[in-house]
Amino acid sequence: VKQRYLLLLLIAIGYIGGNFIVDRWEKTLYYGDSNGYYLHVVSFFVNQDVGDYDQTITTLRQVNPDSSDPREDVYGIRLTDKGQRYIKYTVGVPLMETPFFLLAHAYAKLTGQYPADGWSKPYLLAVGFAIIFYVLLGFYLLIGILQRYFSPQITALVVLSLAFATNLFFHATYVTMAHGFLFFDYCLLLYLTIRFYETPSTLRALGLGAVVGLITLTRVSEIVSALIPLLWGITSRETLRERIRFIGANLKYVVAAPVGFLLGFSLQFAYWYYVSGHLIFNPYEGEGFNFLKPNILRGWFDFANGWLIYTPIMAFSLLGWPLLRRYCRAPQLAILAFVGLHAYIHYSYYAWTYFPGLGSRPMVETYPLLAFGLAASYQYCSERKWLRGLPVIALVLFTVLNLFQTWQMRQGIIWSERGNRAFYLETLATLTPTLNSHRAYESNELQPDEADITLVKPLVQQGFEDTTLFATVADITHGGNYALYDTREFLPWKAELDLAEMHPRDWLKVGVSAYIREEDRLHERDKAAVLVVEIVDGNGKKKTWKCIRISPFIGNKAHHIWPTGEVNMWDEASFYVRLPRGLQPNWRANVFVWNAPGQKMILDDLYVELYRDR
């Protein structure tokens, strides 16, 4: 018991301190999914405008003008056929936020020191920290569960690993989305499942159904959580037969559990019916799933927010799953079925990188289940002298990595959901962004240290002086008499380079000078024109295709990945592309500007140079 409270105290200190260090609690509820969930609460309790949301959104934008208007977002607040507006996010998170909201609301009204509008500091503090309360409560339950099967030492290592070496920390300190709340829900489900099979009762069956309903109320796709109580304890054909006999002899439980589920999910039925006139309603229309092509491997291993790339300690959990037959057989089948189906559903979603997150966020709610595999892996190591120190080393190493990368996300050094291999390697262990990290982010090409390469020769210099070929301007130029001001998607020119005399692993440096007028200021970085290097073989087959957005480099002396470009100044956008190892004499390179969005920008002095390693 003493160890449990010491662990909880340590986690509480780390999470509360982390929340203040990350220092997003005053802004989190104003943006993104965190805002989408919280709008339910403010609308219901403060403005009573459910189904309209005008007053709620108006007050939001009055206190924080930078907040986007979800009515203007194609995937934001939309209209039903009934003419009511609806929020696509289900009401599980708002329900769990409500007690903390009401505390803040009472404080604001009683003291009169803050507006009782749902957006002032007491609300931001109380609701922003609610997720930490639920995570701590989840850990309280999980510690007790694990100690049934594993030693206090193994339990402590597992709990500290989940708390500080995984992206659960990010989701408890950086955002207030569903996943931290679901962590608690799943811990509660495990606790009730174990208690039910120890001493079955109608009340406990009702409770199990209600918790599955609450989990589904939080994210509808989490209905697969029903597999956990269904499959728990099935370890052989004989135990499967026993389970079937148990269900057949206790139909009252079969009735009670679905009744509990309907009670737990009833609030969502009520909301859907109110806004749409239907009990069953698809709020994610247009945001589809492709169940024929799930992206499980990419979701776990891609540098664009891949789960195990940014949360590598959980590889121990996967490796520990087979070992559960030795240490803890009861959850093994439930883990396999639940995690497998959970991953299949979530990585069939069209936006499988799941912005935002430091590592794929749908896996966070699976951690109460995956804790068993992690414990089995640690137990296996502890029984072998040559592996005994590995769990502690892993805990320390991956905690440092996780906390450091959380800080990097906060500083804008990394952006995991838009990451790539080159960007990951360029930013690993860096304290500030660099020009090369920005180039790598844009191009997914590792960039050379310029001290390690030497210029061989210039290859191309295009000043856009031919006014018969290009749309030009003469009043703003970088060099010469004219500069390019052409919004066509493709120019009637590209640099075509013969690569016959070049060596494999040589470098092409490609750059262009750019200028944005005040009236042409760009507000969305994904609508920027790009500078492209394309390498093709003798048959015209593409072998390499690399590009960078041009305007984010303008005036970006800090080399951050967020800017769209400063106005009224010239600057250069450039990057290096390495020629492939298998380079053949008949291959060629094409260099061109691709302006699919039709960005208005002045370009001048495009160049290509050949470099070679010293």
Predicted regions and their residues:
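Membrane-proximal envelope and lipid/glycan-remodeling enzymes
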Residues: 1-456
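Extracellular and organelle-lumenal recognition/adhesion modules and their flexible linkers in secreted
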Residues: 444-614
